[in-house]
Amino acid sequence: MLVDENFKQRLRRLFSVMIPILITQTAIMAMNFFDSSMSGHAGAVDLAGTSIGGNIWMPIFVGTNGVLLGAMPIVAHLLGADKRDNIGKVIRHTIFLAIAFSAVIILMGVLFLDTLLTHLHLEPQVHYIAKMYMAAVAIGVIPFFMSTSLRALIDTLGHTGITMKIYLLALPVNAILNYCFIFGKLGMPRLGGVGAGVATGITYWLEFAIFVWIVHKLPAFEHFRIFKDRFHLDIKQLRENLSIGVPIGLAMFMEASIFGVVALFIAKFGTVIIAAHQAALGFTSLLYMVPLSFSMALTILVGVEAGAKRFEEAQKFSRMGIALNMAIAIFLAVLVYTNRPYIAMLYTTDPVIIEKVVGFLFYAIFFQLFDATAAPIQGILRGYKDVKATFYSGFFAYWVVCLPLGCFLDFVMEHGPAAYWQSLDIGLFFSAVFLTLRMFWLQKKLAREQI
């Protein structure tokens, strides 16, 4: 009976952390969808400009976000070890890094964005919209990354529901601002695709204001005195933040950027294939929100238990998270396989494109199943602060296996555009195997040390 109660308690803890994260990540994805779809209604040039800008911004956003979310396992360990007094210092240094990275990103944009867009040989109007869209988004870069720093605190303390509510509030605000600035409604100027960037920048400021108010006012966070204590740069603390955060950020950057590179290789196959690839990838990205949410939840839960030296409990959370995620992944895989034509019809009515999307979705099923193993284990290893393993795994899977293999299957074996989906599946399979072996080795090592 005690075992049943402990199991139920772990299950409740896991879902209470994971489900709000899932809703949060879906809300963030929905904002990107609003940017694209509403820009598309403004015109094809506007959609092209915001898409180019979004593709440049996404790897930067994901990579920098990863560096800052490196604070999560650090805070989780301190929480488990009952060293709450040190948590405020960790978050203040994360905010410092957020400001520093934001300044570098803005400076790099000022110096190199125009040159980069010129090398892409875009139409003049598309070039202008992409450039101004990025400039508008830059208005909110600093508050966005500072919000990520505060989210690391709030989520790790188990208050993922607060973050969820913030992003659910921001979602309709972002949609309304898009409507106003893209189409020139409610007295606002008609900016087309650039308006989507303005709306995004303003939304980032709104999110940040709410995060600051919550951390400053709510009793659950007052103890950490994030904005009350004066900031003193501690090189040792900064080094810890970077030693954990940079490998996470690089791993996430490599994962995000490989899809951009694959899109460039697929572009040679023509408009129909590009459209089909983007549709299949868009749906796959939506499915990825489930393993990503399990991954983030397991980083928190495993990190707290590892910090408290309760390694057996951390192992139980690991097994539970992987098993649940795999069960959901199998269910979704069956659902996708049996409904591929209907899923394709959500994106297009063109029968030729539908046929290609159906083909790509077949490979997406395997991608989803392998990710159901790899993503949660990435989160588990980060919970143990074993971040270099996930970095090496991502580098090997995507840049040593996936890209060269994709080129081989395309140029030598003549598999066509499917070559890159096949190589993504194989690369992710190797990643899942490596991460699984690493997790078993690490957990056995920690169990031996505890004896």
What spans do the regions from the language model cover?
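Short alpha-helical transmembrane segments in multi-pass integral membrane proteins
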Residues: M1-I21, V75-G140, M188-V246, V302-F367, ...
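Transmembrane helical elements of multi-pass membrane transporters/channels
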Residues: S16-D35, A136, S147, A170, ...
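Transmembrane alpha-helix boundary and packing residues in multipass membrane permease domains
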Residues: I21, Q25, S36-S37, P73, ...
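Helix-terminus/linker motif at the lipid-water interface of multi-pass membrane proteins
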Residues: T26, A30-A48, L117-P124, C180-L191, ...
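Small-residue-rich hydrophobic transmembrane alpha-helices
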Residues: L47-L107, F144-T163, A263, A276-R340, ...
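Short runs within selected transmembrane alpha-helices of multi-pass transporters and secretion channels
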Residues: L68, V137-D155, T163-N174, A196-V212, ...
